Amino acid sequence: MMKSDEFVANVRKSAEDSFTSGLYCAESVVLALARAQGIESEILPKVATSFCGGMSRTCGTCGALTGAIMGVGLALGRSKAEESVAPSYAATQKLIKEFEQEFGSRECHVLLGCDLGTQEGQEMFREEGLRVQCTKFTGKAAEIAARIVSESNS
């Protein structure tokens, strides 16, 4: 069994590698967390696509964070109505709190300082190299989620 620190580092690297290879934030994070749990499916990045760019460029929650929430759900969520939501909810609340403490917000447009739903915002994103910031959000969201999942399973 992989040590917790190694598990967390591998998930972070996997998410960052997927992001720098062309997948977007939510896609990269959920895929990294799924693979770390031995889950392989082409459905996962598809499910996450519309969460990228702050909920499809609507100034919503950061896609890296929503991808991490989906990954937590894969590990701790329920598959039957009689199962408890408590483990997944508690882990998700902790994830959101830590992400907000780290970056000061959970909202894409606040984190980046631009609205990706506008032409001006997209130009600012490109011209100011803000994708580098998204790589950081992607890696950290994956790291926090992996640590929380690892702690919950130990």
Tell what function each PLM region has.
Residues 1-21:
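Polybasic, low-complexity association/targeting segments
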Residues 2-5, 32-50, 114-119:
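Acidic-glycine-rich active-site phosphate/pyrophosphate-binding loop
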Residues 3, 91-154:
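C-terminal binding/interaction regions
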Residues 13-20, 52-59, 126-132:
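A short glycine/serine-rich beta->alpha loop
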Residues 25, 62, 108:
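Short cysteine clusters
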Residues 36-47, 74-94:
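Phosphate-handling active-site elements
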Residues 51-70, 74:
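Glycine/serine-rich anion-binding loops at beta->alpha junctions
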